[in-house]
Amino acid sequence: MLVGSLDIYQKNNKYYIDNVNQDDIFLMLIDSFQLDENDFSTIFSLSSLKEYMKQVNFNNVTTNNLLRSLYQQLDFFRERNYSISFMDVSDIMVINNDKFLFCNADKLLDIKNGKILITQIYDKTNIFLPPEFITNDTIPFSIDYSAFYYSLGIMVLHCLQQKDKKLYSFEEILDYYKEYNFYFTISQCLNINPSKRKFIIF
């Protein structure tokens, strides 16, 4: 099973990473999981967020679990001066139905003067891309390290959209949940100005 850049397999009811290497960024990604053992032996269930969405209707509890899990992990990266280019549902691993982890070492980039350098080609039709990626026409290009929060906000709305399919736009979905405690968090992630995007949880 491929989740992000991790090739994960199950043997004797335990999960293992098949493509472990000694690359510094890869090892930092594994450390960011903060699990009891790196061989995933404490895990009883594991799936990608893309598959998890097909089985579970997102609610307030699930959404808050996702945000809190990613907040802790992203803080781990930020302390080491790293950020993410962008994320989507195929980059997120769900452990034991309540822990959500970013798993793509290829999208981890070092921060220099508050910015990250995008060097990889990407698909402009990806619905999770920040607007700056869509309007950009050159590779490489620099962008604020906080730009990817937009991806996070859209990803959460996409998960909620699977529950309320009658809501046709992300704006309608966000407005529908304006009384929930994660509303402000998502609103801050979706700030039109990338330098003003914030990931704050309550």
Predicted segments with their positions:
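Conserved end of the kinase activation segment
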Residues: F133-Y145
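Conserved structural core of kinase catalytic domains
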Residues: N12-V61
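Protein kinase catalytic-loop region centered on the HRD/HxD motif
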Residues: Y71-S83
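Conserved C-terminal C-lobe helix
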Residues: Y177-I192
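Activation segment signature within eukaryotic-like protein kinase domains
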Residues: L66-L67
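Activation segment/activation loop of eukaryotic-type protein kinase catalytic domains
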Residues: S85-F128
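A conserved short helix/loop substructure at the end of the activation segment
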Residues: L190-F202
